[in-house]
Each structure stands twice: as structure tokens, then as C-alpha cells.
């Protein structure tokens, strides 16, 4: 009860949705973010003449973050997991299939995380992860539009150049996937339409053949795919 009271007092002091409001008033749209096993990405569409605003906003996001709503946002992620994984007919099976598919590699962990981890994740855990991975040396910016490279470089140095290095090297992934010696098969039943998932280990995403593999996936997957037909 005491903790909840402190959370409510904190919320009373916050400016709600200020980040989104600044972008919207500048004519920006489509602000969102996503996470997968390899990266976290933030994207937004802004008018070309608001390029400096983008550099300022995104560098401020990374410069000195204060996790004011950490616990409420942690609750949001837990609820998202319930909706997307635990409350769908096939969600738990898809998650366990992925965990079975990978023997040793960290890809066996779903990007949203296990509920037991989400419930025990502390602010100190999040800050340690942030200081390690959300560092300038681990950052890539992709800009598309009516802008020049020279202009972008000047603004990048002006704003992102303020962010100090973390001093904590990103640890290498040293656990490599073991060679698969036999077919893995999972059979499950649920209140849903029949579904077949076929998974293969192929090439890393930076490999020259990864683009062809993406096209093959598109050709085979979904109700318009060759396998379905």
C-alpha cells in the first residue's frame, strides 16, 4: 500500500505523454518502437525541416534517462505478454516451439521475456542493461528523406556527440548453437484452426543469402503461400 501511494504521488508530478506531444505538434506521425532478439528500434516520420528536432529528441531519449514510470511500464509489458502470448490459442505453443528449436543459443528466449523474469525485474537490472547496450558504440541511425548527408553528420555530432560512452563493453555472445543431430517435432492441441509450423536454421541476417531466404519465407508463408496452397 505504501509503495502504491508513492507511485500515485509520483504520477501527479509527471507531464503525461510529453515526448509524443512535442513530436505531434511539430507535424510528426507514426511514432512507435519495437524489439526483437537482436535489437530495439524507435521510428517516427517527421517533416524534413524538423530534422534537428529529431536529433534533439532522440539524443535526449538516450542522454540521461530517468525511469520514472518503470514499475507501471513493467506492468504494461506483463499485460502485453498476457494478451499476445498467454491469452491466444497458439501463443504458448509458438513460444515453446521456439524454445525447443534452439538448443543453446539465446534466441530460444522470446523477446518479450518470461513472466517470471518480468515480475522480478528491478530498476537496477534495467539501468544496468541500459548502460551496457544503449551506448553510442552500439547505436545505428537510419535517415530517409529530403536531407543531405552533410547536414545529418553535423547534427549527429552536435546532439549524439553529447552522449558519453558507457565504459562497459557489450559482451559477446559466446554460447553457440549446437549442431542439430535429429528432427525435432512438437504436437499440440488447442481450440483453433489446424496449423503447421516448419522451421529451419539457415544463415545469419548479415549473410548475403539472407535476402533470398527472406523472399523464400514470404513465398511459403501465410494463406497466399505455396505451402498453404
Positions of the model-derived regions?
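M16/insulysin-pitrilysin zinc metalloprotease superfamily fold
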Residues: 45-76, 222-223, 227
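A common structural junction motif
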Residues: 60-67, 159-167
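Non-catalytic, conformational "gating/processing" segments within enzyme and secreted inhibitor domains
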Residues: 67, 74-75, 94, 123-159
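Short, glycine/charge-rich beta-strand/loop segments that flank catalytic centers
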Residues: 37-40, 71-80
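Short, conserved charged micro-motifs
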Residues: 51-53, 149-153, 208
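Non-catalytic beta-strand/loop surface segments
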Residues: 4-49, 83-138, 162-207, 218-229
Amino acid at each position: 500500500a505504501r509503495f502504491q501511494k508513492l507511485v500515485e504521488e509520483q504520477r501527479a508530478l509527471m507531464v503525461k505523454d510529453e515526448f509524443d506531444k512535442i513530436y505531434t505538434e511539430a507535424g510528426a506521425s507514426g511514432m512507435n518502437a519495437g524489439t526483437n532478439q537482436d535489437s530495439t528500434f524507435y521510428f517516427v516520420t517527421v517533416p524534413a525541416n524538423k530534422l534537428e528536432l529529431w536529433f534533439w529528441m532522440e539524443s535526449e531519449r538516450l542522454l540521461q534517462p530517468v525511469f520514472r514510470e518503470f514499475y507501471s511500464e513493467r506492468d504494461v509489458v506483463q499485460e502485453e505478454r498476457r494478451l499476445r502470448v498467454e491469452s491466444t490459442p497458439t501463443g504458448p505453443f509458438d513460444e515453446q516451439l521456439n524454445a525447443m528449436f534452439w538448443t543453446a543459443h539465446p534466441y530460444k528466449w522470446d523477446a518479450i521475456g518470461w513472466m517470471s523474469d518480468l515480475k522480478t525485474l528491478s530498476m537496477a537490472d534495467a539501468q544496468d542493461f541500459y548502460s551496457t547496450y544503449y551506448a553510442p558504440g552500439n547505436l545505428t541511425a537510419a535517415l530517409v528523406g529530403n536531407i543531405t548527408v552533410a547536414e545529418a553528420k553535423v547534427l549527429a555530432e552536435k546532439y549524439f556527440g553529447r552522449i558519453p560512452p558507457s565504459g562497459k563493453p557489450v559482451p559477446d555472445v559466446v554460447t553457440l548453437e549446437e549442431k542439430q543431430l535429429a528432427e525435432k517435432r512438437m504436437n499440440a492441441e488447442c481450440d483453433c484452426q489446424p496449423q503447421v509450423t516448419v522451421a529451419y536454421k539457415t544463415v545469419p541476417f548479415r549473410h548475403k543469402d539472407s535476402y533470398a531466404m527472406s523472399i523464400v519465407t514470404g513465398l511459403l508463408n501465410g494463406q497466399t503461400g505455396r505451402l498453404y496452397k
